Structures are given as structure tokens and as C-alpha cells.
Amino acid sequence: MILFPAIDLKDGQCVRLKLGDMDQAIIYNEDPAAQAKAFEDQGFEWLHVVDLNGAFAGESVNGTAVEAILKATKNPVQLGGGIRTLAHIENWLSRGLRRVILGTVAVRDPALVMEACKAFPGQVAVGIDAKGGKVAVEGWAEASRLGVIELAKKFEGAGVAAIIYTDIDRDGVLAGINWDSTLALAEAVSIPVIASGGLASMEDIRRLATPEMRKLEGAISGRALYDGRIDPAEALSVLRAAA
């Protein structure tokens, strides 16, 4: 079970949004690279990064900050937000990124995801962001008619490295993970699932360490880490003991 600390980038700064609303951004660190190094020093083994501006623009906007993060940490980094073409994917992987996360393009052009998986095996993840059980796109600004499991099943056997599943209604508000929908997704597909949105406390961490959660590859934590609701050393100890 991997605990992924999150760095969400807006205007070059490390922020957290409430319910995916760009107008409700809380700045946690003006130096994302320093934050990445701090997470590494705390013992985390991966880093989850999202270019929030890029998710709305459809192309990389916080590229300078991402490059600084890649230079600051030795940990593998996965990046989402504005990655829409094979050229975007190749560009970031060539710069040292371990894994790209494809969200909007997975809905708009599933064939591109499958092509990317063939071209870059093990380095392509799909981000499924849901609101009211339906997949949202374009930086969560638009709702589609697709159901979460319906979309996920399109990529069975394609070589997708992981599905990052975010419940938008719980993101950034410390409401707790949507356990039911997350586990339902993990049970419906063979692709590893990473839970995102709502992780709020050490109680959530202890639940992640239970046998029923072994279907998950990991979980992403943002605000709970920044606000001190989750102690990094204790959380990592609990999850490693359950491995």
C-alpha cells in the first residue's frame, strides 16, 4: 500500500482546492520543489503532482515548477493535468517523470490511451474523476455521461499501469474516502486502483491497512498531510506493517 503525498500546482505554487474549485485555493507552499524534497525527507517513496492550470488549459502550464520538482527529489513522480497528446507524454517521460496520468483524453480519445500504453509500457495511468457517480473532464469543469466502472473497463488489457480514482465531492474537504465506490471499482477491474479525495485522518490510514483494502495499490493524501491531521512517520509505519 503506497501513500502518495500530493502537490497540486496553481500559478507555480503548491495549493489545495476545495471540491475542485480553482477559486477556493489554499496556498501551502510557494516553493513546490522544496515541498517535494520535504516529502522525500519524511520517508515517502512516491510523489503525485497535478498541474491544475494545465488541466483547464489542455496543455502544460506549470512546467517550470514540475521540472524543479523532478530535480529536487529522487522519488518517482506521477503527473496529471493537461497531458493530452503522445508528444506531451513523450516530453514529460523524457524529462524524468516516472508516470503520466491521462484524464480528459481518456474520455475523449480512449484509443490514444491504448496507443500510449503500447509506446510507453508501465508509464501510463488513467485518472478517473467522478462527481455524482459520473466522470468529470476538463479540470472537473464538465460532467460526462460515462459511469466510472464503464470507463475503467474500456482499458482492461490495454496495459494501464493504474487508475487514480478521485471523488470530487470529497476532495479537499477532509470528508473521508468514498470507500464503497473505490472498492467497487477495484473489484470491477484488474487494473490497480489508487484512491484519491477525502483522506482525512489516521483512522483512514488504519482502514487502508486492513485486509479488505489490499485490492488497492495505494491512496493519495493532500490537505490532511499539510494540515497535520496525518503524521507521515506513523502513517508510513502503519501501512508498511500491513504490507
Curated annotation (Swiss-Prot):
Entry EC number(s): 5.3.1.16
Protein name: 1-(5-phosphoribosyl)-5-[(5-phosphoribosylamino)methylideneamino] imidazole-4-carboxamide isomerase
Pfam families from the UniProt entry: His_biosynth
Pathway: Amino-acid biosynthesis; L-histidine biosynthesis; L-histidine from 5-phospho-alpha-D-ribose 1-diphosphate: step 4/9
Keywords from the UniProt entry: Amino-acid biosynthesis, Cytoplasm, Histidine biosynthesis, Isomerase
Family recorded in the similarity comment: Belongs to the HisA/HisF family.
Keyword Amino-acid biosynthesis attached: yes
Organism domain of life: Bacteria
Leading EC class: isomerase
GO cellular component: cytoplasm
